[in-house]
């Protein structure tokens, strides 16, 4: 009897345990990482953010131990934490007066031997520099880490870090900083096979860091292609890296990115470059980059961000806040071309970075559709995985309707591949000989194959040319208009982003299915244009160390090379593709006038964007409030270097922009307004500005009127203020 009772009791306990474990398992599955953003740090001396965060989390979860809940604290530059929460816990936290927002931690995506010469920033003594101030400049790189042994980041010849530096070298396992690479932190989770370290396991972070501030390294090439000196915009500057991207997956969590901003600001970096972007965007208080960059701006730090790689369609821009300096990508005059010689003697010019030399030998040509017996025609034409028959492609050159799958041809024994890309405006590295052709050129090859009994071709090693039309906005570069703030023009500026040769990590091959390992390679993207502008911003700061982030941004935008619709593959998008134009580093040193917007101006902007009361005070960290006038203020009146307005396309419109300029040129200057390139009626009042002293400010209005533009189109003009020496240019954009 006792045995039966004991058995029954054990059975009941076991059943309860099963239910308990099942419930716990379900509860864990229901939890996800949320960011609890609480605004600026309170100014009270006795405020202890970590204790406060712990107390809040204990109260909401009902758990005394929150070790498994708390992911990280934000405690150095702004206030908040990341934690594993259920939906009901998220709702409770979101309702608290001391909380600005609670939003899921998402994954963000990762977005040179001649590019700096192309922009006018020449090597050596040909470019004016302030080496001592440049050496005191620190660029914070929020990315995938860095390869510290690269010559681009050597500390040889550098003195100790600047006295203002408050950071550390916490690079982790087998990682050493130096007097060039002065700081390193990492925020990535521990993954099997990857040591906990700030080392770069994707190559992306090393590439972007060297573009911005890498040392000058001579005789660099990619297997002989692009040979020259690789260097950053400010080679004497220091670098601090903040690794936020998971090794092996090339994804970057927003809770880690926010922690990187928290540290970078407190570490006293001068410029932040962040070549990351979200797939989808929300409001400002749920936008990780916007939050981090706002607090950086409040501390005098400019954040530069890539526009995104989702072009050429409109409204694909993902960097939208006005305190983020948003950079589109263009080409430069250098290009890598890969010729295809057909059996009939015709030569077709394609694009790729092909370092493989087949010695001009011609091989049989086969189309993917003809090399498959188990896929439909479309999939076979694309050389989709599992479609190609090795017996039909081995030892041949395979034509594929897309450049996404040449590796399939290689895996099946092909010696080379010819692929199609309607936007073949940026050469890529492949793991075997590939030439990427335009639609028309690809059809020429296809026609030759279909009309010839034994078609043959040769794919030659790439050549470097220097006569390419430039700058032209890259097809992949994301376009406006701004989907969140319709009256703020984005992108802001354009810089080289295509076919950039820069430092890399030898831990990862330069392309998919590649067996090679290199320390320098060629990559394209707004990830590459972003650090170019960060380097320019740092360069300007060496001449004007007291300038605010908005002054530096204005100087770059108003002195940019003018661009026009012919420099964008989607011509009708114009300024939505290139913003104010192409960056000109030398002109940006002396802009004449600047449009300055400080923290209080951005607070007024937030008032007009319906941020009021307690939430506004939490974000600002002070007693800021919105007056009735500020609440009614239009976002287009933020003192921004460009002017943009969305209007009705069905009726005449009239919009007014209010702006203020600050004289940074010369005293006793008179600037006259001129409007060029417009079908619009534009009135500037006053049309003449007399400035007696440096840093004197003058305000004016710009009123634009006309018939409503056609749907999905824009109409633009250029306002130029000139004193005969300086030409301060701002785009004016109106769209429906």
Curated annotation (Swiss-Prot):
Keyword Endoplasmic reticulum carried by entry: no
Alphabetical GO biological process terms: proteolysis
Thylakoid among keywords: no
Keyword tags: Autocatalytic cleavage, Glycoprotein, Hydrolase, Protease, Secreted, Serine protease, Signal, Zymogen
Active site, per annotation: 143 (charge relay system), 204 (charge relay system), 527 (charge relay system)
Gene Ontology MF terms: serine-type endopeptidase activity
Signal peptide: 1-24
Domain (PA): residue spans on this chain: 362-442
SUPFAM superfamilies hit by this protein: Subtilisin-like
Propeptide feature ranges: 25-111
Taxonomic placement: Eukaryota, Viridiplantae, Streptophyta, Embryophyta, Tracheophyta
Record localization: Secreted
Record-linked PANTHER family: PROPROTEIN CONVERTASE SUBTILISIN/KEXIN (PTHR10795)
GO cellular component, one term: extracellular region
Pfam family, one: PA
Domain of life: Eukaryota
Start and end residues of each Peptidase S8 domain: 115-589
Protein name in UniProt: Subtilisin-like protease SBT4.6
Enzyme Commission number(s): 3.4.21.-
Family membership: Belongs to the peptidase S8 family.
Residue ranges of domain Inhibitor I9 in the record: 33-110
Post-translational modification: The C-terminal propeptide is autocleaved.
Positions annotated as glycosylated: 174, 227, 450, 564, 598, 610, 668
């Amino acid at each position: 009897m006792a045995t039966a009772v004991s058995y029954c009791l054990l059975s009941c306990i076991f059943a309860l345990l099963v239910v308990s474990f099942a419930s716990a398992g379900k509860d864990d599955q229901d939890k996800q990482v949320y960011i609890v953003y609480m605004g600026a740090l309170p100014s009270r001396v006795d405020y202890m953010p970590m204790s406060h965060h712990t107390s809040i989390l204990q109260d909401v979860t009902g758990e005394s131990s929150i070790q498994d809940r708390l992911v990280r604290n934000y405690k150095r530059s702004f206030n908040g934490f990341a934690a594993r929460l259920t939906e009901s816990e998220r709702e409770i936290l979101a309702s608290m007066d001391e909380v600005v927002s609670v939003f899921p931690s998402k994954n963000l995506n990762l977005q040179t031997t001649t590019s700096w010469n192309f922009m006018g920033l020449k090597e050596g003594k040909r470019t004016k520099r302030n080496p001592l101030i440049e050496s005191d400049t620190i660029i914070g790189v929020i990315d995938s880490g860095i390869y510290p042994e690269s010559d681009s980041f050597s500390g040889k010849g550098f003195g100790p870090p600047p006295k203002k530096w408050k950071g550390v070298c916490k690079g982790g396992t087998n990682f050493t900083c130096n007097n060039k690479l002065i700081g390193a932190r990492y925020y990535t989770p521990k993954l099997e096979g990857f040591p906990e370290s700030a080392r770069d396991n994707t190559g992306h972070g090393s590439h972007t860091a060297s573009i911005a501030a890498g040392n000058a390294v001579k005789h660099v090439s990619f297997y002989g292609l692009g040979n020259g000196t690789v260097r950053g915009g400010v080679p004497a500057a220091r670098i601090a890296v903040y690794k936020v991207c998971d090794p092996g997956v090339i994804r970057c969590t927003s809770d880690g990115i926010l922690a990187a901003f928290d540290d970078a600001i407190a570490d006293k970096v001068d410029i932040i470059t962040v070549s990351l972007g979200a797939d989808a965007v929300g409001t400002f208080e749920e936008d990780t980059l916007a939050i981090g960059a706002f607090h950086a701006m409040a501390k005098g730090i400019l954040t530069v961000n890539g526009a995104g790689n989702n072009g050429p369609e409109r409204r694909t821009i993902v960097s939208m806040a006005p305190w983020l300096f948003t950079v589109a990508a263009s080409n430069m005059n250098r290009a890598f071309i890969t010729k295809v010689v057909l059996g009939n003697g015709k030569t077709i010019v394609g694009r790729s970075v092909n370092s493989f030399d087949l010695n001009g030998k011609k091989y049989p040509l086969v189309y993917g559709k003809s090399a498959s017996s188990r896929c439909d025609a479309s999939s076979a034409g694309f050389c989709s995985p599992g479609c190609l028959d090795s017996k039909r492609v081995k030892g041949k050159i395979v034509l594929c309707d897309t450049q996404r799958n040449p590796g399939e041809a290689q895996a099946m024994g092909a010696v080379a591949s010819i692929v199609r890309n309607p936007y073949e405006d940026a050469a890529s590295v492949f793991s075997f000989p590939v030439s990427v052709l335009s639609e028309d050129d690809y059809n020429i090859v296809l026609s030759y194959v279909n009309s010839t009994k034994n078609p043959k071709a040769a794919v030659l090693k790439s050549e470097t040319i220097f006569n390419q039309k430039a700058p032209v906005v890259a097809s992949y570069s994301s376009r406006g208009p701004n989907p969140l703030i319709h009256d703020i023009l984005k992108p802001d500026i354009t810089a080289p982003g295509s076919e950039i040769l820069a430092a890399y990590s030898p831990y990862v091959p330069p392309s998919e299915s590649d067996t090679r390992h290199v320390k320098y390679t060629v990559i394209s993207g707004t990830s590459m244009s972003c650090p170019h502008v960060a380097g320019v911003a740092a360069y300007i700061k060496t001449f004007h160390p007291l300038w605010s982030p908005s002054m530096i941004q204005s100087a770059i935008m108003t002195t940019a090379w003018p661009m026009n619709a012919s420099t964008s593959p989607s011509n009708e998008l114009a300024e939505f593709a290139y913003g104010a134009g192409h960056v000109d580093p030398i002109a940006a040193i002396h802009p004449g006038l600047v449009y300055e917007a400080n923290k209080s101006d951005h607070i007024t902007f937030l008032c007009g964007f319906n941020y009021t009361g307690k939430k506004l005070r939490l974000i600002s960290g002070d007693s800021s409030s919105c007056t009735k006038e500020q609440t009614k203020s239009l976002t287009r009146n933020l003192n921004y270097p460009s002017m943009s307005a969305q209007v009705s396309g069905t009726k005449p419109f009239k919009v007014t922009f209010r702006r203020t300029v600050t004289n940074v040129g010369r005293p006793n200057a008179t600037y006259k307004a001129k409007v060029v390139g417009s079908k619009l009626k534009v009135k500037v009042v006053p049309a003449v500005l007399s400035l007696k002293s440096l840093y004197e400010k003058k305000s004016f209005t710009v009123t634009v009127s006309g018939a409503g533009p056609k749907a999905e189109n824009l109409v633009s003009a250029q306002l130029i203020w000139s004193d005969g020496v300086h030409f301060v240019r701002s785009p004016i954009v109106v769209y429906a």
